[in-house]
């Protein structure tokens, strides 16, 4: 799995690392797989908001709830990424050839965007079915709400160390 691969990567890099650690070019993880997941999440959102595909997508649960859970999951991935790397492409990310060189956003701007994304997702949920095939919470929207609020709380705790007025 993911942890086993990371551990093996660390071990190999420890043995192959040069004498001067500050000049090491080795890195255990990069953000490419995370942006790949976010691309898939954006596709879910697109399928549920596009007039041509919306009806077919509703067979997998309420369109609003699919978009809400996708945005919560996207916020989760971006929170992990910004905690690890700090500044990264957020507001202009995942535009493909439309914007091959997205600007980097500050961590403060990313966190502001993530709080807004989660709040929007929570307010857009409806009483319809949650997403079918949901391997995290089985389509249980109450659990998705708890997860979203927990994510907001964790982000606020992290942010409180940097900016007490926001956290």
What are these regions (language model features)?
Residues 1-2:
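Hydrophobic alpha-helical membrane-insertion signals
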Residues 7-87, 97-133:
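Conserved, well-structured interaction surfaces
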Residues 24, 89-94, 139-141:
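Solvent-exposed, flexible loop/coil residues
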Residues 82-93, 162-167:
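Short, well-structured active-site flanking segments
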Residues 112-130, 141-167:
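Aromatic-residue-lined binding/catalytic grooves and analogous aromatic/hydrophobic interfacial grooves
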Residues 133-139:
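N-terminal post-signal-peptidase region of extra-cytosolic proteins
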